[in-house]
Amino acid sequence: EVKLEESGGGLVQPGGSMKLSCVASGFTFSNYWMNWVRQSPEKGLEWVAEIRLKSNNYATHYAESVKGRFTISRDDSKSSVYLQMNNLRAEDTGIYYCTTGFAYWGQGTLVTVSA
């Protein structure tokens, strides 16, 4: 059974930082590109970031709205993917999901950016 479990969300002030984690099980994690996607009432579902495989030198790609502020990383030995978020803005508020190429999704973790 494939499982993805996100954690690390919560309330943070504008300009603050937060790190999200996602632990995977039930598949060979190192063989899959991983993504972070977020959902908000205002913007709907929005792709945030992608990290590829060791064979791709762990190449990363980002949505323009988060470029320079967010960093995606992975640890294949821990079957985990991370999202470091800096200089957070109100518009970053939403439920953040990790996905395996959009085939499998976690339950999400809520990030609220508010003073």
UniProtKB/Swiss-Prot annotation:
GO terms for molecular function: antigen binding. Pfam families: V-set (PF07686). It comes from Mus musculus. GO terms for biological process: immunoglobulin mediated immune response. Disulfide bonds join 22-98. Residues 1-114 form the Ig-like domain. This chain was isolated from a myeloma protein that binds inulin. The keyword Hydrolase does not apply. This is Ig heavy chain V-III region J606. Keywords: Adaptive immunity, Disulfide bond, Immunity, Immunoglobulin. GO terms for cellular component: extracellular region; immunoglobulin complex. InterPro entries: Ig-like_dom (IPR007110), Ig-like_dom_sf (IPR036179), Ig-like_fold (IPR013783), Ig_sub (IPR003599), Ig_V-set (IPR013106), IgHV (IPR050199). Coiled coil: none annotated. Gene3D superfamilies: Immunoglobulins.
